[in-house]
Amino acid sequence: MRVVVLGSGVVGVTSAWYLCQAGHEVTVIDREPGSALETSAANAGQISPGYAAPWAAPGVPLKAIKWMFQRHAPLAISLDGTPSQLKWMWQMLRNCDTRHYMENKGRMVRLAEYSRDCLKTLRASTGIEYEGRQGGTLQLFRTAQQYENATRDIAVLEDAGVPYQLLDASQLAQVEPALAEVAHKLTGGLRLPNDETGDCQLFTQRLAKMCEQAGVTFRYNTPVDKLLSEGGKIYGVKCGDEVIKADSYVMAFGSYSTAMLKGLLDIPVYPLKGYSLTIPVKEDNGAPVSTILDETYKIAITRFDNRIRVGGMAEIVGFNTELLQPRRETLEMVVRDLFPRGGFIEQATFWTGLRPMTPDGTPIVGRTPFKNLWTNTGHGTLGWTMACGSGQLLSDLISGRTPAIPFDDLSAARYQSGFSPSRPQHLHGAHN
């Protein structure tokens, strides 16, 4: 079968890889001159299934009001009055109760756990290297309340069979030795030993090369104008004067998926702007070993080989990609506070990207009302964490195989009134 994949970020390239491995003839189309040059370029570097959780959570509406008056707030909102922004925010607010939070987090963890298993298999079969580490993730708490709140997430982890360690402040240095110097600022941490890290862009670009060697065609520098449809099917992709045709089409344009599907399918994917710094390591024993997640500022600090990646924050500002100095100052403040000897911060590279976020936090992966159009988008801040599992899942569906995990509640159909999954959507499917 001929399949066109729209988008060459980590989600698009992993989709292409698994489709190619399933025997399909795959073409990837992207407006950029290469793969992983937008949202996948400089993310936080975490592969953290256990921390997969929606931004829509109990208490977030009140926190958002408080954050409006804080200099180093993790979330910023700039209302532009557009219907798409207002509708998306309203849908997000409706997901901020405990029932929705647990339901959404459950399916996110299910897909993320499966994705890590898929990445492990891919790594073993290809030998791909991307400055990856398997040292786990450590979520740091600065208040007693944060430490107590961790018990809510632990319940989901236990249900999913995810190993964890709840540590007090005196135990943090056993996992991350450099934290011994700042333990007095912290109340404890939640460690997930099975989490991983790695350079998402490096992985994506190397996997794209492997895709090419396996026969995948990449059409870079090719902006897409629209999808052409007739009779409940897509019959082509219009790129300037050219129409590229295939048997099936995969939408993996990230935040731009919503506009590209306008008139065909209404999906609630909205850009969530994030920032990162990439810092050369200064003192090895003053830098992190793996990944730190600062719960207060929602900022991740990840160790690559000779670099530290500091990423986080969320701005609901539409498609604005301006680099704001106050955001850089927040990233610098957090890394200086936790790892004062870790890196040459003055040499850091500053970056911003648009994460494609759904109001319930779960990506939109699967079928659409058009029988040959599929979506793989809306992964938010977890594209790197969920990419391999999403790609394998989509390849299985397109190939007519039954996926290894429950999938009905991952497609756009879940936003339709009266939707109910056709089979139990349990967490343990990730380990089947």
From Swiss-Prot:
It is an enzyme of class 1 (oxidoreductase). InterPro entries: DadA, FAD-dep_OxRdtase, FAD/NAD-bd_sf. Pathway: Amino-acid degradation; D-alanine degradation; NH(3) and pyruvate from D-alanine: step 1/1. This is D-amino acid dehydrogenase. GO terms for molecular function: D-amino-acid dehydrogenase activity. The lineage of its organism: Bacteria, Pseudomonadati, Pseudomonadota, Gammaproteobacteria, Enterobacterales. It comes from the Bacteria. Its cofactor is FAD. PANTHER family: D-AMINO ACID DEHYDROGENASE (PTHR13847:SF280), SARCOSINE DEHYDROGENASE-RELATED (PTHR13847). GO terms for biological process: D-alanine catabolic process. Transmembrane segments: none annotated. Coiled coil: none annotated. NCBIfam families: PRK00711.1. One of its GO terms (cellular component) is plasma membrane. FAD binds at residues 3-17. Keywords: FAD, Flavoprotein, Oxidoreductase. Oxidative deamination of D-amino acids. Its EC number is 1.4.99.-. It catalyses: a D-alpha-amino acid + A + H2O = a 2-oxocarboxylate + AH2 + NH4(+). Belongs to the DadA oxidoreductase family. The keyword Flavoprotein applies. It comes from Enterobacter sp. (strain 638).
